[in-house]
């Protein structure tokens, strides 16, 4: 596949960025499964600083509005593929992934209230708030139709009663989004 001039220029831009950060290592440890552990011999920064650097340069959260901590650009699948390809060719870590970024942020952008978007999207994208998902239950597994955990609105707060198991990345998370019966 040969790209047109706009995408050839963009590819060179991404390659230059990757070269600048080649061998990046994280100052906050490498025991987090939500992204690459980084490399060695290159610059050093925290995962949160790296997330912000990627966003500021348009290499992560490209179509998330700036007001919620994203880059604020148009969705462009070809540019996204170029970014993924060039990062995978280099010794430059990509962004953190995880349940919050991959599942919660798109849901909040589509269905969340303004308050929810303001409270959760930016810190999630910036790696300051790590999420796990609470779907599986002891007698239901991941059969969501069989969920037993209940959510009840008491005053202005939701009270959750039930159990969740197999909660991916729970040991790294500050927050959990879960499915409950209401």
Q: Model-derived features: where do they sit?
A:
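N-terminal glycine-rich flavin-associated loop
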Residues: 95-115, 141
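Active-site-adjacent elements of ketosynthase-type condensing enzymes
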Residues: 139-147
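Conserved protein kinase catalytic domain
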Residues: 84, 105-108, 121, 177
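A structural signal for short hydrophobic beta-strand segments in well-ordered beta-sheet cores
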Residues: 149-152
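Amphipathic, small/basic residue-rich leader segments at the start of a protein or domain
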Residues: 1-98, 115-126, 130
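Short, solvent-exposed loop/turn elements at beta->coil junctions and helix N-caps
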Residues: 67-69, 136-140, 165-166
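A short core secondary-structure module
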Residues: 157, 161-182
């Amino acid at each position: 596949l040969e790209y047109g001039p706009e995408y050839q220029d963009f590819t060179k831009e991404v390659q230059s960025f990757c070269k600048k950060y080649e061998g990046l290592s994280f100052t906050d440890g490498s025991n987090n499964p939500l992204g690459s552990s980084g490399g060695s011999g290159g610059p050093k920064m925290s995962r949160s600083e790296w997330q912000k650097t990627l966003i500021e340069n348009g290499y992560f959260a490209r179509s998330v509005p700036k007001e919620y901590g994203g880059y604020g650009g148009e969705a462009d699948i070809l540019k996204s593929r170029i970014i993924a390809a060039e990062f995978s060719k280099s010794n430059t870590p990509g962004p953190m992934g995880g349940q919050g970024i991959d599942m919660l942020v798109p849901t909040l952008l589509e269905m969340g209230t303004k308050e929810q978007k303001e409270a959760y999207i930016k810190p999630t994208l910036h790696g300051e708030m790590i999420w796990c998902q609470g779907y599986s239950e002891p007698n239901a597994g991941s059969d969501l139709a069989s969920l037993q955990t209940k959510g009840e609105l008491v005053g202005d707060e939701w009270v959750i009663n039930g159990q969740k198991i197999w909660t991916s990345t729970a040991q790294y998370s500050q927050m959990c989004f879960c499915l409950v019966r209401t």
